[in-house]
Amino acid sequence: MARRRRRACIALFLVLLFAFGTLMGLRTLKAPDGLPALGPGPELAPFERRPEGNPAPARAPAAPAAPPPPPPRTAAPRASLGPAEADPAPRQSLRVYSDLHAFYYSWYGSPRREGHYIHWDHVMVPHWDPKISASYPRGRHSPPDDLGSSFYPELGPYSSRDPDVLREHMTQLKEAAIGVLVLSWYPPGMADDNGEPTDDLVPAILDTAHQYNIQVAFHIQPYKGRDDITVHDNIKYIIDTYGSHGAFYRYKNSMGKSLPLFYIYDSYLTSPEAWAHLLTQNGPHSIRNTPYDGVFIALLVEESHTHDILAAGFDGMYTYFASNGFSFGSSHQNWKAVKNFCDTNNLMFIPSVGPGYIDTSIRPWNNHNTRNRVNGKYYETALQAALTVRPEIVSITSFNEWHEGTQIEKAVPKTTPTRLYLDYLPHQSSLYLELTRRWAEHFIKEKEQWLM
């Protein structure tokens, strides 16, 4: 009898032990507190990979309160947006928005088209202090494996003159809902220190953009001897040569007049007094109320430039730089004050947003200005900050400035014997195009509310 009771107790103990073990096992399957029960979207994914030893990103200043971000996409499978799977004709069903501008560079060349690489083999720029410069590598990059970029383009080190490249770029711009391509421009026969003249490529860019319902504005770069007189000649040349093209961008101002819009890079290199000769009503060679009038947007770098831009007769200002905190103009926390100044003085404020910044492939000493992409989070923070100030136009730095790592163009993972390139993993190469479209649609909806 005692033996039977002992067996029953042992059996009961084993049953209880089994039940307790099962319950504990089930508890281990529960998601830990603070983690999402579902798979992460782009905002929750792990940080992007970067080569060992790459500097940790500097923490950007907190962005101001912003409108709530648009709802994330579902995880439902969808067809690839790549050109190989898409219809070869322009995707006319996708809308683009003329209030969304992207800075575009046509300075790239390859042996297949130009006989040699252009810009992909960019020099490593020495620091202005010889003592600092001595600590960093010098020389020129050696494509195709070694590019003057921290990312590797999906198209490889391409030529901007390749018609297939132009079509693919317009496809990507359209996927991103970008309605205006802002073309980096030098006068005929001129180029930057690492490039070759590209004005003869403008007709092909205009023609291709027109097929995709994209418009083209001009980003006038600094060149030797640039002043108010030469810019007058530049404006006349651009309007006379390209102004009648269907893809030439014109902005409708508050008076209902459609005028060409020009971005003037490094405008602060010319004095406000000289600009006033060109941009004010009574200037000695004023273009106001002439066939060459336009909307002229100056670059804002330092806080004092706001008053210089106003005195010079410009119509507005943009910030260009994608490194939050790099300058007064590029710091998100200053945009509200800048917008208030512009509103008070009847100027347009065009904030520039970027997906990140890293130019150490060409300026190896400049790692303190690196801004990590954080899988799109940095980009979305900038877009939030821009929408908070209710701008008329948002500009994107950039579509394809690969040297400074600000591109939203598709990039792919790449490892060579001497280089480990950054990439967009764990996301697809189209991540920044998709984020741009999502925020563009949100921007347009917000604008409709602002105008009510």
From Swiss-Prot:
Principal EC category: hydrolase
GO molecular function terms noted in the UniProt entry: hydrolase activity, acting on glycosyl bonds
Pro residues bias spans: 64-74
Lipid bilayer topology: Single-pass type II membrane protein
Cytoplasmic side: 1-8
Domain of life: Eukaryota
GO-annotated cellular components: Golgi membrane
Residue ranges of the TM segments: 9-29
EC code: 3.2.1.-
Places the protein is found: Golgi apparatus membrane
Keywords: Golgi apparatus, Hydrolase, Membrane, Signal-anchor, Transmembrane, Transmembrane helix
Keyword Acetylation on entry: no
Ranges in the topological domain labelled Lumenal: 30-452
One Pfam family matching this protein: Glyco_hydro_99
Region (Disordered): 40-90
InterPro entries per record: Glyco_Hydrolase_99
PANTHER family listed in its UniProt record: ENDO-ALPHA-1,2-MANNOSIDASE, GLYCOPROTEIN ENDO-ALPHA-1,2-MANNOSIDASE-LIKE PROTEIN
Family classification: Belongs to the glycosyl hydrolase 99 family.
Protein's name according to its UniProt entry: Glycoprotein endo-alpha-1,2-mannosidase-like protein
Gene: Maneal
